């Protein structure tokens, strides 16, 4: 599994993150279980909003108020309860998380939403920065939705750079295949952030699967089953 296409992308994502964070703090100093909320807030400066009864409706209402608009809701979009949600778009990128979850579950949900952000936003932003380094400040403002720059969009089009993504809002029975693929990817990234492959495999002992599962929960904070 380590050499699968999925895992190679996961390793590329996490390595890019650790390289970026190296200018802020030493990733090797992050103790297990890792505090994902701290990493999001101080490493990537992405806001985290906790809601005790998080739902799609609650998130939309919050974003309306943040944009200075009257709260509104589209009747054709069914409301549903959420553990977490990544919003990509104006007024800024935000991660929502349900506040009344157990600490280790909330930490995992945040890691999952961070996985979406890293794969769908962060890597694309890093590619733009690498391709157009002279536009660094503009790219950072554009990717944080502080402004729209038509010239930058044109340069990106000429260079063949990918567009900024939109947020996922559809899950459940109507889940699109590409969205399901993104969910699997975010789940794998979350697990790699919380329990790095190389660290975990060095601790595994044959014929001790029960003890190993308990170790993943106690030392790394992994939930016993997939939640998101």
Task: State what each model feature region is.
Residues 1-228:
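Active-site hotspot residues in diverse enzymes, especially metal/ion-binding acidic/histidine motifs
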